[in-house]
């Protein structure tokens, strides 16, 4: 932890900029989850349920 703070001080980065950058990084993780991960998971669950229903109905026809 001391090495990171020394690096920030040596790079002449203000604490406000470092805090803002950290906040934006975390916000981008949440945005990625909302825009990519959640819709992809919902789609995969939908396809999986649909496939399960098709296999169940195909088994009953035999």
UniProtKB/Swiss-Prot annotation:
One Pfam family matching this protein: PsbX
Superkingdom as given in the UniProt entry: Bacteria
Keywords from the named record: Membrane, Photosynthesis, Photosystem II, Thylakoid, Transmembrane, Transmembrane helix
GO cellular component, one term: photosystem II
Membrane-spanning intervals of the chain: 26-46
Keyword Phosphoprotein attached: no
Localization in the cell: Cellular thylakoid membrane
Main localisation: membrane
Keyword Cell division: no
Membrane disposition: Single-pass membrane protein
Entry's Gene Ontology BP terms: photosynthesis
Protein family per UniProt: Belongs to the PsbX family. Type 2 subfamily.
Function summary: Involved in the binding and/or turnover of quinones at the Q(B) site of Photosystem II.
Quaternary data: PSII consists of a core antenna complex that captures photons, and an electron transfer chain that converts photonic excitation into a charge separation. PSII forms dimeric complexes.
Annotated protein name in UniProt: Photosystem II reaction center X protein
Originating species: Prochlorococcus marinus subsp. pastoris (strain CCMP1986 / NIES-2087 / MED4)
High-level lineage: Bacteria, Bacillati, Cyanobacteriota, Cyanophyceae, Synechococcales
């Amino acid at each position: 932890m001391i090495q990171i703070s020394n690096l920030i001080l040596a790079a002449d980065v203000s604490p406000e900029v470092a805090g803002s950058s950290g906040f934006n990084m975390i916000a981008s993780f949440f945005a990625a989850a909302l825009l990519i991960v959640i819709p992809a998971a919902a789609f995969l669950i939908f396809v999986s349920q649909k496939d399960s229903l098709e296999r169940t109905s195909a088994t009953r026809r035999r």
